[in-house]
Curated annotation (Swiss-Prot):
Homotetramer. The lineage of its organism: Bacteria, Pseudomonadati, Pseudomonadota, Gammaproteobacteria, Pasteurellales. It comes from Actinobacillus succinogenes (strain ATCC 55618 / DSM 22257 / CCUG 43843 / 130Z). Alpha-D-glucose 1-phosphate binds at residues 108, 174, 189-190, 207. The keyword Transcription regulation does not apply. One of its GO terms (biological process) is glycogen biosynthetic process. This is Glucose-1-phosphate adenylyltransferase. GO terms for molecular function: ATP binding; glucose-1-phosphate adenylyltransferase activity. It catalyses: alpha-D-glucose 1-phosphate + ATP + H(+) = ADP-alpha-D-glucose + diphosphate.
Length: 431
């Protein structure tokens, strides 16, 4: 009798590669000095912590993180927060920066090329049987081992994670059609007119940017792709169509491996690639029963929280509304200020008479007296002067700050320096 394969049999043969080199240009100044996966999220985590935590919780302890753009803060975060795996047991989180292996002027030319340039290390050092490719810039909880098991049981050589999205949103994703066995029959990357799902005219089946490959098949397709004159060096544009043509591409619906559904049974996956989506995903966490439960200890999201004293709240003015429906990280000092429906990261000082509403405040911000901040994202190290009002007058805000399509105001220290006519100081990337 042949042995029944379980997901626990497969994780040791799998190498995870997290693609974390992207800038996230739609986040504008928020990613000027940090890669998108290194961006703060949820009060005391970074975006990449979700992919990394999913790996550890799934039993996947052989992880390579591919970096390129503005990688310093990301590398420091990985070194200080994710170096606990015992290498003597073959477990690791290795960093794979762009090393210009093609020539001295060639950085990673795309997602597929970032793996191709590390292929010698992958083949000769890690020697995996399966390779799991992840984007490092999405917010979700997922048991990857279930996807790997489905990949093996289906006989696929490549499996792509998929999720149902509104058709009008599908232009930003790869979109596919599948048969009753989840074999992919059509795939198009970022279509201008996304095809609808059968029987669901307002929905499309979108790629999550998560792939499982048989390692040998991935090596073969990367070699074929890099030698093609029409290549974009991209998984969605090149590798997926190739696997489709080879008839070895299958889909894995996210609802088969999603961890931590909400009380309505809904699954949660977010691409926080715009100012609006980043703001909304943070603000969602302050609700009584958020779709994403960051307090769930059955599937914990690890990170590298700052060592800080407990936050301090001082109120001797009974007229102050104080704090409600908000997340406040450690090291904050709140004095006679009203804070509602907001996320404050570590070591933020808010002075008396100030009102903060529906705002995301990144670490080490100082807010002066009698300020108003509404529907803002305030970047790290910003110092808001006394009496400043942001998010109140859109016309005035537009003169100095960036305003998103939905009216969210992004505030950076450089913007404030320009507003005050000061010399713009160079910023380090020790984020």
């Amino acid at each position: 009798m042949s042995k029944v394969i379980t997901k626990y049999d497969l994780v040791g043969d799998t190498l995870v590669l997290i693609l974390a080199g992207g800038r996230g240009s739609r986040l504008h100044e928020l990613t000027d000095k940090r890669a998108k996966p290194a961006l703060y999220f949820g009060g005391n985590r970074r975006i990449i912590d979700f992919a990394l935590s999913n790996c550890i919780n799934s039993g996947l302890n052989r992880i390579g993180v591919i970096t390129q753009y503005a990688a310093h803060s990301l590398l420091r975060h990985l070194q200080t927060g994710w170096s606990f795996l015992p290498q003597e047991r073959g477990e690791f989180v290795d960093m794979l920066p762009a090393r210009q292996q093609i020539d001295d002027n060639t950085w990673y030319r795309g997602t597929a090329d970032s793996v191709y340039q590390n292929m010698a290390i992958i083949k000769n050092h890690y020697k995996p049987k399966y390779i799991l490719i992840l984007a490092g810039d999405h917010i979700y909880k997922m048991d990857y081992s279930q996807m790997i098991l489905d990949h093996v049981n289906s006989g696929a050589k490549c499996t792509v994670g998929c999720i149902e999205v509104p058709r009008e949103s599908a232009k930003e994703f790869g979109v596919m059609a599948v048969n009753e066995n989840l074999k992919v029959k059509a795939f198009v990357e970022k279509p201008s007119d996304p095809p609808a799902m059968i029987g669901k005219p307002n929905s499309s089946l979108a790629s999550m940017g998560i792939y499982v490959f048989n390692a040998e098949y991935l090596y073969e397709t990367l070699e074929r792709t890099v030698n093609s004159p029409q290549t974009s060096h991209d998984f969605g544009k090149d590798i997926m169509p190739m696997a489709l043509e080879d008839e070895v591409l299958y889909a894995h619906p996210f609802d088969r491996s999603c961890m931590g559904r909400n009380t309505e049974g809904e699954i949660y996956w977010r691409d926080v690639g715009t100012l609006d989506s980043y703001w909304q995903s943070n603000i969602d966490l302050v609700s009584k029963e958020p779709q994403l439960d960051i307090y769930d200890q059955t599937w914990p999201i690890r990170g590298n929280p700052v060592q800080a004293y407990p936050s301090k709240f001082f109120y001797d003015d009974p007229a102050c509304k104080q704090v409600d429906n908000s997340l406040i990280a450690g090291g904050c000092v709140i004095t006679n200020a009203s804070i509602s429906y907001s996320v404050l990261f570590d070591n933020i000082h808010v002075n008396e008479g100030t009102l903060i509403d529906e705002s995301v405040i990144l670490p080490q911000v100082k807010v002066g007296k009698n300020c108003i901040l509404k529907r803002c994202i305030v970047d790290r190290h910003v110092q808001i002067p006394d009496g400043m009002q942001i998010g109140v007058d859109p016309e005035e805000d537009s003169k100095h700050f960036r305003i998103s399509s939905k009216g969210i105001v992004l505030v950076t220290e450089k913007m404030l320096q320009k507003m005050k006519g000061e010399t713009v100081k160079s910023e380090d990337d020790l984020d």
